[in-house]
């Protein structure tokens, strides 16, 4: 042994404003969702980067048969990550569902769709070149579900999510509990805003972080 002291690894600590408690995750039960307030459209789609750290739990009533997606599945404005029938899928522009052919590995993963660099990755599972098509419509990016003809939802634990436009961080979502009414949702560190449930039911709060 060299006798050296062990190297300390710094951990970024996220401090939320007074009245909020940081959570490890929040969980939906197929009815809850969050509208991020960010739209994909013809002017920005090729600059967007969408990062979702989550565990997809499935059991969908409203999302359609085995479609478990975060983002937009609106015709002409596909921009999503997720899975269908046990296979990883993504959509990046236009109206084409992109089948990776890679089987889903259960558990927590970070999904990243980076249109600017034409990359789609799922942590520890896949890293591929993304097919990017033109966007001809406008649609909101959704968490715990996806925009379609209506909003479709599914069961999921979400640990964090970020949206970039080019090098600009537009949203940085952290799971939290809003006091005093103990409302679980996401706090955006960029806008300093709380995002509560836009659907039915209520999010399940994970343990305090």
Where are these regions (language model features)?
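Extracellular, beta-strand-rich glycan-interacting domains
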Residues: 3-5, 51-56, 151-180
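Enriched but not universal
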Residues: 1-21, 190-209
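Beta-strand-rich interaction surfaces with strong enrichment in secreted/lumenal proteins
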Residues: 36-38, 98-103, 131-132
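Flexible glycan-contacting loops in extracellular carbohydrate-active proteins
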Residues: 128-157
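Surface-exposed loop/edge segments in extracytoplasmic proteins
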Residues: 21, 76-77, 95-100, 125-130, ...
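Short, aromatic/His-centered strand-loop micro-motif at the edge of beta-sheets
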Residues: 88-110
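Localized edge beta-strand/strand-to-loop motifs within extracellular or lumenal beta-rich domains
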Residues: 103-123, 166
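Extracellular glycan-recognition modules
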Residues: 17-89, 165-170
